[in-house]
Amino acid sequence: MTKNQEYALQYADYAMAQMRRYGIPASVTLAQGILESSNGQSRLARNENNHFGIKATSSWIAEGGKYGIYTDDKPNEKFCSYDSVGDSYEHHSRFLKENSRYAGCFKLSPDDYKGWAQSIEKAGYATGGKYAENLQKIIEQNGLQKYDRQVMQEMTAQGRQFGVEHN
């Protein structure tokens, strides 16, 4: 089993829960986590439970959000710090859902991982090039689409809609 597959297996439940809640493909969430956190091994992931490289905004800090200081694109940047990896996954989903620049993503089907990857890149999620291509490669090489299929089948069988809270 590859490190990417180990990461996916460890965090698939979080990604699938986010797919049910927000309609974001689990495969894309996992691929972003793999890429952004170096399979959960980056300093940011290990020290702050931040698996998606989300920076701490002034509103995050004003609301009492914790943060760590790291050098990324610039020295001494503030990154969100979370109590758990699950909190990181939830904040990542809310970050995409509540940020208008990602609105186009939510017009796509929850199982359209290629469209989602391209739309996330187009909206400017990452500063590096070929972001969508890298996400798709991670998804396809590690069979992460199986998590999307599992959630799609489950939601269809239960007659449930994505993006609607279910008790």
Name each region found by the language model.
Residues 1-167:
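Catalytic cores of secreted/periplasmic lytic hydrolases that degrade extracellular macromolecules
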